[in-house]
Amino acid sequence: TMILTGIFRVRFLLLLFKVAFCFPVMEGEESLSGFLESTSTLSDDSITTAFINELKSLSSRNMSSCDQCITRLAIGKSLALVRPDLVPKVFTTWCLDTGHWSNATCISTFSRNTVEASYTGTNFADMLSLMDPFDYDGQLYCYYKESKLCEKPKTPNITLSDMWPPKQKKHFLAPEPSGNDTFNVLHISDFHLQLDYVIGSEANCTTSMCCTPHSRNKNTSSSAKGYKEIWNSFYESSYAENGTFIRGPYIDVFQNSSIWMPAPTWGHYRCDPPEILINSSLDSIVEYSKEKSLEFEFAIFTGDLVDNDELKYTNYEMTVQSEEVVYRDIKAKLDRLPVYCVMGNHDTFPYGELAQENHGFSNYFSWNAELMADLWEDYQWLDTKASQYARKHYTGFSIETKLGLKIISLNSNVWYRKNHYAFWNASQPDTFGQFEFLINELVESEAKDQRVWIITHIPFATDALPLPSKLYAEIVERFSPYTIAGIFFGHTHLDQFEILYAGSGSEAKTIENVLNVGWISQAVTPWVENNPSWRYYTVDKKTFSVMDSFNFYTNLNETFSNNGLEPVWKFEYSAREAYNITWPETSPLNGTYWHKVAEKVKTSVEYRQLYQNY
C-alpha cells in the first residue's frame, strides 16, 4: 500500500475506487480502508478540507456540467465507502461555499441526519456508497436531483412479463356492471396537519409554509391593521370529545405590528390546516352521510399526514405525533368505518426517504412501518395478517373487503424522485420487491376472477422515476381491464385524473389505446391556494368499477370573516353530470370516459375552464 504524506489527494482515492470497481465490492472497500489506515496521521479536518477543495476544483476544469456532476458523485463515493460520516460536512460546505444551491437547500440536502431536523445528508452518503456514478445511476441522479445537469438517460428496456402468465382472451374485456346495484366509498387525502399553527401568526410569509411561530415576511413595512375591519375570525376554538364545537376566547391579533396578514382560526391558503380544520372536514363527512342517509362501505386515505414546512422545522417527534393525531381523529370521527391507508412522501423521517430491506439501511425506517401497521391494526382497519405484512414490506399490504374486492396498498416512496435510495441500482426493475408483490397479488386475483383496487400516494405521471413508471404501465396494461377495477392517488392536492394508454408517445393517446384511469383526489389541506375538499364514489357492486364521484369543499376565505363560526361545507359537482359527456348511464366512469373528457378539455375553452374550476 502506498503511503502518502502532506496533502491528502482525492484523485488517488478516486483511482483506487475505479480500480476497485473491477473487483468484488469488499475488495474495493478493503483497499480503500487500508489506504485510509495508512494515512492515520491525517486528521478528519485535513481529509474534509482536501475533499472540499477537490470538489471545488472541478469548476475550473475543462468539463461539462454533466461530467462535473458525475465526478462529484464519484469523489463522494470514494469517501462514502470508507468514511461516510464525513460526507455530510464535505458536501454541505462545498455547496454553501460555491453557492451551488440556496443555503436552505444545501443544508437540508447534505447535512447529517438528526432527530431535530429532516436533513438527508446521511441518506445521501448511503446512496453514494451503493450507486454506480459512471452508469445509469449517476446520469439519473444528475438529471433529477441536480436540475438536469445531465441529459435524461434512456430508460432501460426492461420487462417484468416473465412474472405473469399469458393474457387469456377473456382478460381483454372488462366485466359488465350490474346496472344500478351500487355502494359508496369515501376518498380522503393529504391532511398535512400543522401542529404548530398559530392564530395571528404571519399568513403572508416570504418562504415556504406560513402560519407558524417562525413565519416571517421579509418586507416589514406593511401592517395587518388593514384587515382589522374585514377579518374577525381569531378565536381559540376547539371541538369537544363528543364533537360539539366550542368557540373559544377572541385573540387580539392586531397588536403585532410586524404581521402582514394574521392567520385566522380555521386556516389559510398558504398554510397547512390546524387540527380544528381537519376535524371540521371529518365532521362534514359524518353530517352529510346522516343528512342523506348515506352509508359508506369503507374509506381510502391516500397519504400525507405531516405538514409541508421547511425541512429544518420538521423533526422526528412531530412526524410521529402528526401520524398519531390524524389517524386518531379519523378513527374518532368515522368510528367503525374501515379505512385503508397508504404512506405519503411526507409520512416518513427524514422526508421522502425509504431504503431497500436487504441492503443495510432499512432499519432507519422500520419504526415507521411498525407504527403505521400498529395504528391500522389497533383501529381495526387491518387484520393481523395484513398488518404483519405491512410491518415488513414498507407499509404495503393487500386485504379483501366484505364485498369481495381486493385492495392493494403500495408505498410510492419506492419510485419517488426525492428518495435517495431510489437512485442506486436504478437500472434494475424491482430493488424494493414491491412490483413482485403487486404482480403476485394480481395474478392470484385474476385466477379467481376477483377485481382489485390499487391505492398509493404519488401518481406515476408526477414525481415518479421513469423505469418504475414504465413497469407500472406494463403491469396495468397486462391486468386491465379485467382485474384492475380502480387506481387511486393523492399527492398533488388537486382534483385530477391520470389516463393510462397502451404504447408510448403522444401518438398512442387514442381512445382505442385507453387502458385504465387513475383517480387523483383533492386535499383537505388548503396549501397552497386550494379550498379544503373531499369526495366519495358510487361503486358497482358486481364489478367494483366507479360509477360516479361526488366532490365537496368549503370556501376557506369565508371563514376569515365569519366571527369564528364553523366552515360551511358544500357539494361541488358530480363527475358524471358536470362534463355533459354522452355516456351510457349504466357504464362506469372508466378510462374511455375520461379520455372523452380530456379531448373536450383540450379542444374547448369552455371545458378547459370547467376543469380548472373543479
Where are these regions (language model features)?
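Acidic, His- and aromatic-enriched active-site or binding-groove loops in soluble protein domains
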Residues: 319-333, 361-382, 477, 481
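Metal-dependent phosphoesterase/phosphodiesterase active-site architecture
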Residues: 23-111, 116-291, 298-301, 362-409, ...
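Active-site neighborhood of phospho(di)ester-bond hydrolases with catalytic His/Asp-centered motifs
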Residues: 187-189, 265, 297-304, 335-345, ...
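Active-site-proximal segments of metal-dependent phosphoesterases and phosphodiesterases across multiple
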Residues: 416-436, 443-489, 499
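Cleavable N-terminal signal peptides of Sec/SRP-targeted secreted and luminal proteins
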Residues: 4-22
